[in-house]
Design a protein with these regions (language model features):
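RNase H-like, metal-dependent nuclease domains and their acidic two-metal-ion catalytic environment used
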Residues: 1-87, 93, 97-101, 105-193
Length: 193
């Protein structure tokens, strides 16, 4: 593969349309800057960067620069017997099936509108491995756009309650109602993201 590319999707929460895509090879802090700018352009969109590998540096950039809406993932910590929250999304053996199933359902039901040719091309090569049974990129293909999209599909299915804005006592919907007087974000030319 030559390394993983960074990938980001902007999905409209109401229409479930893919309205923007970014894909490329960037250093983590530069990708953090790109996400910050994309999120800001799309009305402070909820960002859910992967925590895996260099994703910690991306999250660190966003947190250090006070990006206002970062997804927080809840996890039960058996050492302290309490639930903890961590910024970003962790893709692992337990969470990968969740995001892949959400993506499959979104595509199967035709509820998502995909506009990016590169995303569609990756989806065509994202297949079930006959030996392992795992759904993954076919040999020589990439899946960065697919995994990014799958995370977005899953998070859309569980919104509006799981996000970080510095105040974990309020839900996303309450915050948006407080800020905008309605249940979703609105800006001229850009809907809720």
């Amino acid at each position: 593969k030559g390394g993983n590319f960074s990938a980001a999707h902007v999905l409209d929460l109401e229409s479930f349309e893919q309205v923007a895509v970014w894909h490329g090879l960037e250093e983590p802090y530069q990708f953090g800057r790109i996400l910050f700018n994309m999120g800001e352009f799309y009305n402070c969109a909820l960002l859910a960067p992967e925590r895996n590998n260099n994703g910690i540096s991306v999250i660190d950039y966003l947190r250090t620069n006070s990006y206002p809406r970062l997804y927080r993932m809840q996890k039960f910590d058996y050492q302290v017997m309490d639930e903890t929250e961590r910024l970003g999304w962790m893709t692992n053996a337990h969470t990968r099936p969740l995001i892949i199933d959400a993506l499959k359902e979104s595509v199967r039901s035709n509820s998502i509108v995909l506009n990016d040719a590169d995303t569609l091309a990756e989806l065509r090569t994202f297949i079930r491995n006959q030996k392992t049974g795992k759904i993954e990129a076919a040999g020589g293909s990439m899946d960065d756009l697919v995994i990014s999209l799958a995370i977005g599909c899953y998070l859309r299915s569980i919104l509006p309650t799981d996000f970080y804005d510095g105040d974990s006592d309020s839900s996303y919907l309450d915050k948006m109602k407080e800020r905008w007087g309605q249940g979703h974000t609105v800006a001229v030319g850009r809907g809720g993201y």
